[in-house]
């Protein structure tokens, strides 16, 4: 019935996301290497690394409230499958499509609300491409380096952005990169965005909640990190390298489906 359908959609989303994570990882590593030679640090679970998520669970149709987000992470932790892979972190995250108001133009944008920021961090390497720090207050934002250079926006500048029915001013406190947007193009486009035609930015959770009129802790993504780097199933071989990870994903899908069906 309907819940079966829901479950199937979600599983496809998760598996697709795992593949995305793999490709993002490869391109991120190559990209990082060309930018500043910090290639060896990019995956570190340290201040210099970004710690890409190993599994994403996405809510493609709406928003989970704070209570549901926390409950899902709790259920995932409590019912983790018998596996050599150990759960390190489950972090609810919010990501919304929106707008940046630039001069008289409405520029399509994607905004991320990043709270703990342990998994899939914003990357501000010690390199002249980037500067500043992460957003901490609800009126601060880190903008992507391509937004900074393409629209001539710098540290300390105020920008006006929108999401949902909200429209507010934020102060730029950082310029950096994020693994979701290394290839800087709108979703579905094969071509990189021309300067000034696309924006991405990274706010505190409180900042994005305030902008979009959301409740505290609302999320539409769960980023799951396991200890170490698990083996992924590489799409270009017949061998199933990521068997262990596939079992974990199957189990997570069941947990999420069961939890949502019972709420």
Positions of predicted regions on the chain:
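Membrane transport/envelope proteins' first extracytoplasmic loop
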Residues: 1-263
């Amino acid at each position: 019935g309907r819940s079966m359908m829901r479950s199937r959609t979600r599983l496809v989303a998760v598996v697709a996301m795992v593949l995305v994570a793999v490709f993002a990882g490869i391109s991120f590593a190559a990209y990082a290497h060309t930018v500043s030679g910090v290639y060896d640090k990019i995956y570190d679970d340290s201040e210099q690394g970004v710690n890409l998520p190993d599994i994403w669970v996405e809510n493609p149709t709406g928003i989970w409230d704070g209570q549901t987000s926390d409950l899902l992470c709790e259920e995932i932790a409590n019912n983790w499958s018998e596996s050599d892979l150990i759960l390190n972190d489950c972090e609810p995250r919010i990501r919304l499509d929106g707008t940046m108001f630039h001069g008289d133009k409405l520029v399509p944008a994607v905004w991320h609300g990043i709270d703990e920021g342990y998994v899939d961090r914003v990357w501000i390497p010690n390199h002249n491409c980037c500067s500043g720090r992460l957003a901490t207050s609800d009126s601060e934002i880190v903008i992507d380096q391509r937004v900074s250079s393409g629209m001539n926006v710098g540290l300390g500048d105020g920008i006006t952005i929108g999401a949902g029915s909200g429209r507010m001013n934020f102060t730029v406190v950082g310029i950096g990169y994020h693994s979701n947007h290394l290839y800087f193009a709108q979703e579905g486009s094969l071509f990189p965005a021309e300067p000034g035609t696309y924006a991405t930015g990274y706010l505190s959770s409180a900042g994005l909640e305030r902008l979009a009129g959301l409740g505290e802790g609302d999320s539409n993504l769960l980023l799951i990190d396991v200890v170490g780097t698990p083996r992924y199933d590489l799409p270009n071989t017949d061998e199933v390298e990521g068997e262990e990870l596939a079992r974990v994903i199957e189990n997570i899908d069941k947990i999420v489906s069961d939890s949502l069906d019972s709420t």
